[in-house]
C-alpha cells in the first residue's frame, strides 16, 4: 500500500490563503456593520424633548405656508419615517457581500491567485452598487426666502488683475491634477493597490517558505538557504522585499517573483548567519541576473 506524502510548504500556503480569506470576510462584515450603525440606534421620543422643541414642525414647505395644525399628521409621519425590513436596501447588499466572501474562499482553496480573485471581486461589487444604489440627481438646496438680491458692481482694475491671476493658477492646478501623479509614486498613494501587492508577495513567499535556494559561499562553493532560516515574520519579509527594484511591478501584474533574489536581498540585510556564509560580490551579480530574467517576461 503506497503512502501519500504532503509537502509542508503546500500546507503552509493553504493556511495562509485561508487566513487572508477569513480576514477579507471579517473586513466585509465589519464594513456592513459600520454602514448599518445608524439603523441600530433607538428612536428619539418626542415627549422627552424640551417644551419648545415639541412645537416645531419639520417639512419642506415655505415659512409662509406653516400653520398650527400639527396634531393631525403626527401619527402618519411616524409610520412613514421607519422603513420596513423588506424595503431595507442594505439587507440584500449584506447577503450579496456574504456570498462574495464565500466565493472568494472557495476560489482560493482551488489555488487561484489572490490578486486576480480580489480584482474580479472588486469589479463585481462596484457594478452591483452602481446598479442598485444609483447616485441621486443633484437638487438645488438654496433657500430662496433667505437670499438677498445681488448688487451689480464694477471691479476696480487692481481687483480684475488679481482675479485673472487666481484663475490662471486654478487652471494650472487643474491641469496638474488631470495629468495624475508621477509614474514612480502612483503605487504609494493607492492603499488598496498596496494591500493587493503585499498579499501577492506574501502568497508567493509562503508557497516556497521552506524551499532551499543555492547561493555562492565565501569558500568558493555553494550553500543552501531558505526563508525559514531568516527567523523573521512574513510581514517583515514582505516589507523588505518591496524595497528590491522590480518586485512591486511584478506583483502588480501577477507574475512570478524572483524568490532567490528576494531571499538574498532580505538575508544580506537582516540575517547575520547569511552574511557570514555568502560571497557578497557574487551575490550581487546573481540577484541582478535573476531580476533581469524575470523582468524580461
Curated annotation (Swiss-Prot):
GO terms for molecular function: RNA-directed RNA polymerase activity. Keywords: Chaperone, Host cytoplasm, Host nucleus, Host-virus interaction, Inhibition of host innate immune response by virus, Inhibition of host interferon signaling pathway by virus, Inhibition of host STAT1 by virus, Inhibition of host STAT2 by virus, Interferon antiviral system evasion, Phosphoprotein, Viral immunoevasion, Viral RNA replication, Virion. Residues 168-179 have a biased composition (Polar residues). Gene3D superfamilies: 6.10.140.1560, Phosphoprotein, C-terminal domain. Coiled coil: none annotated. Residues 140-154 have a biased composition (Basic and acidic residues). Disulfide bonds: none annotated. A motif (Nuclear localization signal) lies at residues 211-214. CDD domains: RABV_P-protein-C_like (cd21032). GO terms for biological process: symbiont-mediated suppression of host innate immune response; symbiont-mediated suppression of host JAK-STAT cascade via inhibition of STAT1 activity; symbiont-mediated suppression of host JAK-STAT cascade via inhibition of STAT2 activity; symbiont-mediated suppression of host type I interferon-mediated signaling pathway; viral transcription. Phosphorylated by host PKC and by an unknown kinase. One of its GO terms (cellular component) is host cell cytoplasm. It comes from the Viruses. Pfam families: PP_M1 (PF03012). A motif (Nuclear export signal) lies at residues 49-58. Non catalytic polymerase cofactor and regulatory protein that plays a role in viral transcription and replication. Stabilizes the RNA polymerase L to the N-RNA template and binds the soluble protein N, preventing it from encapsidating non-genomic RNA. Also inhibits host IFN-alpha and IFN-beta signaling by binding and retaining phosphorylated STAT1 in the cytoplasm or by inhibiting the DNA binding of STAT1 in the nucleus. Belongs to the lyssavirus protein P family. Homotrimer when phosphorylated. This trimer is stabilized by binding to the L protein. Binds soluble protein N, and ribonucleocapsid. Interacts with host STAT1, STAT2, DYNLL1, DYNLL2 and PML. This is Phosphoprotein. The lineage of its organism: Viruses, Riboviria, Orthornavirae, Negarnaviricota, Haploviricotina.
Amino acid at each position: 500500500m503506497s503512502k501519500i506524502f504532503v509537502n509542508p510548504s503546500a500546507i503552509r500556503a493553504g493556511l495562509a490563503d485561508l487566513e487572508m480569506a477569513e480576514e477579507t470576510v471579517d473586513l466585509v462584515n465589519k464594513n456592513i456593520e459600520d454602514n448599518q450603525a445608524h439603523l441600530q440606534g433607538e428612536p428619539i421620543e418626542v415627549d422627552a424633548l424640551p417644551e419648545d422643541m415639541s412645537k416645531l414642525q419639520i417639512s419642506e414647505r415655505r415659512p409662509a405656508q406653516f400653520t398650527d395644525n400639527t396634531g393631525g399628521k403626527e401619527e402618519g409621519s411616524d409610520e412613514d419615517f421607519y422603513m420596513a425590513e423588506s424595503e431595507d436596501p442594505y439587507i440584500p447588499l449584506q447577503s450579496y457581500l456574504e456570498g462574495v466572501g464565500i466565493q472568494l474562499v472557495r476560489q482560493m482553496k482551488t489555488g487561484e491567485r489572490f490578486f486576480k480573485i480580489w480584482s474580479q471581486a472588486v469589479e463585481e461589487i462596484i457594478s452591483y452598487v452602481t446598479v442598485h444604489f444609483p447616485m441621486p440627481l443633484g437638487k438645488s438646496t438654496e433657500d430662496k426666502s433667505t437670499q438677498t438680491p445681488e448688487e451689480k458692481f464694477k471691479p476696480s482694475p487692481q481687483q480684475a488683475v488679481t482675479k485673472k491671476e487666481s484663475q490662471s493658477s486654478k487652471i494650472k492646478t487643474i491641469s496638474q491634477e488631470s495629468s495624475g501623479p508621477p509614474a514612480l509614486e502612483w503605487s504609494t498613494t493607492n492603499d488598496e493597490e498596496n494591500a493587493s501587492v503585499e498579499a501577492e508577495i506574501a502568497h508567493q513567499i509562503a508557497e516556497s517558505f521552506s524551499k532551499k535556494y543555492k547561493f555562492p559561499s565565501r569558500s568558493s562553493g555553494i550553500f543552501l538557504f531558505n526563508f525559514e532560516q531568516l527567523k523573521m515574520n512574513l510581514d517583515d519579509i514582505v516589507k523588505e522585499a518591496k524595497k528590491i527594484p522590480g518586485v512591486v511591478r511584478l506583483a502588480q501584474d501577477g507574475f512570478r517573483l524572483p524568490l532567490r533574489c528576494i531571499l538574498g536581498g532580505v538575508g544580506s540585510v537582516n540575517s547575520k548567519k547569511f552574511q557570514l556564509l555568502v560571497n557578497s560580490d557574487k551575490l550581487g551579480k546573481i540577484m541582478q541576473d535573476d531580476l533581469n530574467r524575470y523582468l524580461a517576461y
